[in-house]
Design a protein with these regions (language model features):
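Short Pro-Cys-Gly-centered "Cys-loop" motif that presents a nucleophilic cysteine in a tight turn
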Residues: 1-82, 96-338
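Short beta-strand->loop micro-motif that forms the acidic, two-metal-ion catalytic signature
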Residues: 89-97
Length: 338
């Protein structure tokens, strides 16, 4: 949350007492801006875009993001208990040895993802708002509440009925390496699948993420079922989420699901703002534009001039139930109200 601070200018011509008060006030302000942190205490980290716009338009967006996060987490030796990318923001429940290590992880992963994102979306400049939001969770109850809150983001935004049924909470991967597809038996698979698995393992073993160009090439010759299998394989291979650490707060996976289903969790330390009744509107807009415009890639739409984006804005306003602000967020378009 941004705070409005009133600054009093005190000079050496003022009384010594007033000058001393000014110095104390400055110190208090600077301390208040320092990130609250405690070693190996779980932190809820939150990111949104600088312009409030959408981040994720396709499954490839989520996969690029996920593999970058996991590769960076291994290098920075942070422990992730939960994470959930939402269409226009991201959540992490994460432990780190120091505040600088946490900041380094967020910086490194964000920088790499922004490079990939900007390239595919034909844009320049920063993507995420800075600094990222974070709030430490000092008690077991606070940790449980936060984990539930992160996992329940998709149901709360009506993307799914149950958290574990939504691939991008990664909850289902706690008990299965292929929760959304048939088990992949590589030796019995078609050559394009075998080739894809080999290239993915080469990237993974080298500590590298999966870039857009590689993923687009690997997915292009696959059937719908094979794409689901490969997605499960990628997530299970790269996954760094410490499910055992998370389960300690719930005793078992069954108890975890019971807690997630019975309460939404809460977050009082980080202020989130939501637009519209459901985030399903964003995927609906993707389907409409793919049908109406038939672009080679949905991201190409983001490179259109503002005038053409405004024409799409009018189209989407006519064909969807999305709010004006949601359509503007989707197109990264500034819409003036009369």
């Amino acid at each position: 949350m941004r705070q409005k601070i009133t600054i009093f200018v005190v000079t050496d011509q003022d009384s010594p007492a007033l000058l001393k008060c000014g110095i104390v006030l400055y110190i208090l302000i600077m301390k208040s801006r320092k990130r609250s942190f405690q070693k190996n205490v779980l932190n809820h980290c939150y990111q949104r875009t600088a312009d409030g716009g959408v981040i994720f338009y396709s499954n490839l967006d989520y996969l690029v993001w996920f593999t970058i996060v996991c590769a960076t987490a291994r290098k920075r030796k942070v422990r992730i208990l939960a994470m959930c990318p939402m269409p226009d923001h991201t959540h992490f429940s994460i432990e780190a040895a120091s505040s600088s290590e946490l900041a380094a992880f967020m910086r490194d992963y964000s920088s790499l993802f922004v490079l990939e994102h900007n390239k595919i979306c034909h844009r320049k400049g920063p993507l995420f708002d800075t600094p990222f939001g974070s709030a430490p969770k000092y008690s077991d109850k606070m940790v449980r509440t936060n984990l539930i809150y992160v996992w329940n983001n998709p149901p709360e935004r009506k993307l799914i009925g149950k958290s574990e049924d939504y691939r991008w909470t990664f909850l289902a991967y706690a008990v299965s390496d292929h929760p959304f597809s048939k088990k992949l038996v590589v030796r019995n698979s078609r050559w394009p699948v075998q080739k894809a698995v080999k290239e993915i393992m080469t990237q993974f073993n080298a500590g590298r993420h999966l870039p857009y160009a590689l993923l687009k090439r690997l997915y292009e010759p696959l059937t719908a079922d094979e794409k689901q299998q490969l997605t499960d394989f990628i997530i299970s291979t790269y996954n760094v989420i410490d499910y055992n650490a998370a389960l300690k707060y719930f005793n078992s996976y069954e108890d975890l699901l019971l807690a997630v289903h019975s309460t939404t969790g809460s977050e009082h330390d980080i202020k989130e703002s939501f637009v519209g009744k459901t985030d399903k509107d964003y995927s609906a807009m993707v389907r409409i534009l793919l049908r109406e415009l038939q672009p080679k890639d949905i991201h190409d739409i983001l490179a259109l001039p503002q005038e053409e984006k405004y024409e799409l804005f009018l189209l989407l306003r006519r064909l969807t139930y999305a709010k004006t602000e949601q359509i503007a967020k989707f197109l990264h378009l500034a819409v003036k109200r009369n």
